[in-house]
Amino acid sequence: MTIKKRTKPEYWESAKKILRSRDSVLRSIIDRTDDLKYLQKTCTPFQTVANAIIGQQISIAAADSITKRLKKACGTINKDNILKSSSVELKKTGLSNQKVKYLKGLANHIDNNRHYFKALEIMSDNEVTENLCKLYGVGAWTAEMYLIFQLLRPNILPLGDIGLINSINRIYNIKNTSIKKNY
């Protein structure tokens, strides 16, 4: 599957304008951020889910390191390369036993359901989440990452994302880490 480069989502400029007008902290961040760098699609749907699985409950640096080793071991991260790699080979990249099972399960599912990702494109956010969460090892956070980074859906706020929570705490100087309770 080829990766189609795309421009900003149609809602992007309007969303930035609203956020800039309502929050001076976000205005400052928006004004100094190159949003095109973050909006470029660089992964296939399979890679987006695989990357989210790899990144579950570990730091971005750790996930990047494992992903680099996985690419070195497998080549392109896709269902075929995951399926042909042994669990031992995958574990050597730093993946846990569970994440190896999750990736193998994802690869098997996509191998048996070739139009799975295409079908997700036309579903509502809730339907996408429900469908993805049926996959072994995929929960709400992974589904939210897919909605954000693959489908570029608006109005997704992953309040279970520790990186997001830590960033909000840092930029707003919040000492209480129970942000989810406030929203």
Specify the residue positions occupied by each region the protein language model found:
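Alpha-helical ds-nucleic-acid-binding substructure associated with the helix-hairpin-helix region
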Residues: 59, 63-136
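Catalytic DNA-binding helix-loop module of base-excision-repair DNA glycosylases/AP lyases
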Residues: 124-169
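C-terminal end-helix/capping segment
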Residues: 161-183
